[in-house]
């Protein structure tokens, strides 16, 4: 492959050697690979149909001269999944999830490790050093072991022990640092310097950025397969790209991928970028909102999501700020609690179990949609960067399981078995009846409720059936649509209030229309909350549910 390395500070061009980390002219460590975009742009697209479904299908745009397929673990070409239920909940139907959990070690760092290890192997390098909060060390360990290379993995003491054991399982040497992630990186760098070993430098590592840009290639190729080509180009781009960040390497690479496709004429625009940080360690967000060109640092991160605890982003912020501003994007931060809640919503509504760091991106998505920054008509791609394997302590709370204890006898009496089963019977959970004539709306309300707790949920598709169900089951809460044929919600409410047994059941009314003053008067004093459909993500709805079923 033909490519050169260009310095981002002085513009000097040089050949690529993995061990050469600085510009030979100005000594800058910020450099990137450049290719013959005119030639590749014309010749590569027709070749893709006959190539394998991995990131090496774009090998002409990667800094490995002769890719060794024997080193591959099937990295890249992860699914782009439409988030149907999230889209309904948020009123934004074109949300897609780039499911990086489906890489060889279940995170987007597999791309970084695959390309970097391939380049190092090609250069004859046999040892490397990496600082990590878990995922990158696991990915590097897997690929290094496959390539017969030695990895020295420096991790903070807060990395879950199960991740440390996985790193060690591959044969890597784990060095645990009691300190911050920034301190961990400093120790790793000094170790590599003293031993003259190759050091992964995160966003300053050319192969890392080049690997991440394949996410952009895949997104555009996959969106084109779903929606067809763009208006003025063979491939399509989303309106927004959303990803959680720590040091910012992922979006830096993804932006380069979109920029290169634009240079080659494959796409006609670059999406707006939304990097999301945890509030307890959000130096880029804070600096951007202050209008600063250089990032303020955070010496003591205050987040439980350790994988995002980079307090000093360095120059990554300067580049990301330029990309966010030029695409009319936005930096945003979310609390740990918002991220943990997003984990539940994503798992229970889309069947996707994401690690807390990935959930930060989804919490950011919710926030940007609520603020009106992301519009209902926008096409949005959110990077689900990693799997929550295993589920991290504290995310599920104390009551995530129920225990059944049997007597220590050889045979369990039938009565004992039945008694045990009653401990997990759904009747122990609060009952909620949904009365709604639209199936999609019933399903949406059910999924939102299920994402927030354990409820016994029953449904009725019209007012008369709903009234009978409520009178029979006497639920803890009713969620009621007003506008239904034959017996509408007003008639249901009047019938419930006329019966002493049902008069005390709290009611949340959900309606798609603006009520007239007369209609509001009819409801006065008879319901606990009035919610507009399309605003179900509003915390008010969920808080009302929780308060009414206590």
Residue ranges and their predicted role:
Residues 1-422:
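PLP-dependent amino-acid enzyme catalytic core
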Residues 510-511, 533:
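Hydrophobic/aromatic residues positioned on beta-strands within the core alpha/beta folds
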Residues 459-468, 489:
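Helix N-cap/capping motif at the beta->alpha junctions
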Residues 484:
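Receiver (REC) domain active-site loop signature in two-component systems and cognate sites
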Residues 443-451, 521:
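Charged docking surfaces used in two-component/phosphorelay signaling
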Residues 473-479:
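Active-site beta3 strand of CheY-like receiver
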Residues 468, 490-503, 522:
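Short amphipathic alpha-helix used as the core "switch/output" element in two-component signaling
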Residues 436:
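Conserved acidic carboxylate
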């Amino acid at each position: 492959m033909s490519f050169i390395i260009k310095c981002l500070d002085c513009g000097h061009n040089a050949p690529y050697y993995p061990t050469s980390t600085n510009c030979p002219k100005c000594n800058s460590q910020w450099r990137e690979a450049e290719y013959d975009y005119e030639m590749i742009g014309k010749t590569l697209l027709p070749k893709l149909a006959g190539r394998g479904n991995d990131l090496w299908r774009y090998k002409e745009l990667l800094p490995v001269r002769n890719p060794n397929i024997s080193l591959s673990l099937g990295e890249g070409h992860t699914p782009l999944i439409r988030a149907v239920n999230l889209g309904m909940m948020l009123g934004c139907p074109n949300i897609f999830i780039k499911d990086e959990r489906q890489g060889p070690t279940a995170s987007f760092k597999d791309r970084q490790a695959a390309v970097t290890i391939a380049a190092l192997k090609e250069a004859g390098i046999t040892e490397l050093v990496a600082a990590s909060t878990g995922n990158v060390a696991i990915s590097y360990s897997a690929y290094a072991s496959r390539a017969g290379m030695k990895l020295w993995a420096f991790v903070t003491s807060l990395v879950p022990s199960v991740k440390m054991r996985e790193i060690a399982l591959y044969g890597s040497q784990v060095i645990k640092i009691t300190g911050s992630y920034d301190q961990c990186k400093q120790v790793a760098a000094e170790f590599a310097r003293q031993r003259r070993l190759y050091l992964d430098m995160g966003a300053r590592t050319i192969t890392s950025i080049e690997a991440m840009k394949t996410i952009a290639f895949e997104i555009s190729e996959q969106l084109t397969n779903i929606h067809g080509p763009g208006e003025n180009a063979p491939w399509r781009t989303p309106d927004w790209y959303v990803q959680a960040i720590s040091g910012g390497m992922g979006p830096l690479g993804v932006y380069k991928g979109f920029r290169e496709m634009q240079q080659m004429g494959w796409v006609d625009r670059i999406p707006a970028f939304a990097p999301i940080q945890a509030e307890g360690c959000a130096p880029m967000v804070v600096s951007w909102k202050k209008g600063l060109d250089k990032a303020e640092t955070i010496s003591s991160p205050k987040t439980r999501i350790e994988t995002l605890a980079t307090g000093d982003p360095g120059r990554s912020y300067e580049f990301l700020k330029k990309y966010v501003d030029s695409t009319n994007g936005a930096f945003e931060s979310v609390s740990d609690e918002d991220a943990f809640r997003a984990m539940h919503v994503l798992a229970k509504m889309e069947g996707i179990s994401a690690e807390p760091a990935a959930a930060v991106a989804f919490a950011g998505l919710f926030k940007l949609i609520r603020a009106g920054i992301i519009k209902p008509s926008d096409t949005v791609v959110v990077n689900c960067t990693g799997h929550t394997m295993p589920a991290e302590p504290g995310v599920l709370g104390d009551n995530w399981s129920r225990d059944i204890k049997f007597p220590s006898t050889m045979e369990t009496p039938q009565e004992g078995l039945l008694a045990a089963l009653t401990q997990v019977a759904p009747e122990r959970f609060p009952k909620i009846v949904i009365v709604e004539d639209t199936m999609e709306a019933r399903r949406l309300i059910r999924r939102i409720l299920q994402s927030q707790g354990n409820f016994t949920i029953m449904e009725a598709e019209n007012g008369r059936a709903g009234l009978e169900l409520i009178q029979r089951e006497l639920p803890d809460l009713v969620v009621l649509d007003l506008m239904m044929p034959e017996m509408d919600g007003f008639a249901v409410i009047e019938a419930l209030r006329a019966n002493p047994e049902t008069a005390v059941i709290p009611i949340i009314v959900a309606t798609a229309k603006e009520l007239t003053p007369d209609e509001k008067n009819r409801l006065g004093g008879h319901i606990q909350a009035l919610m507009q459909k399309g605003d179900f993500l509003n915390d008010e709805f969920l808080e009302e549910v929780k308060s009414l079923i206590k």
